Amino acid sequence: MINVFQQPPQGIQTAPHEPRILAAGHQVAVREVDLEGVADKEGLMLAFLRGLGLTDHFGRNWDALYDVLTDPDARPVRFALVLRDYGHFQARHKQLGPQLQQVLLGAQAEAAARGRSLWLLAEEPDHDTRHW
């Protein structure tokens, strides 16, 4: 199996097993955003605030999220974002899902244009805890 970090970032990819260990060997910084309990846009922005270690000054909107993901002073040159429960989030949120994807892919393209790498790694929980 090819290590995801041996290739340039290519959209939203399935997270490898033990992404932090693999990333460390390739000098890639990793942060994790847990989308499992997100119910609305405010919850989504709070998940990114926590996952990225942002301050309360984070604007909690799409433009602010794009800006923090593309800020060369705030993000390392080689950076991976692990999106926990991404597939389930997309299935649950028919409007928020595509909006988030657009911001993430736009930030990834901007990073690449600046000679930087932003991996977007979708990771699903090991067990199904959803209650319908």
What residue ranges belong to the model's regions?
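Positively charged, polar, low-complexity stretches
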Residues: 1-132
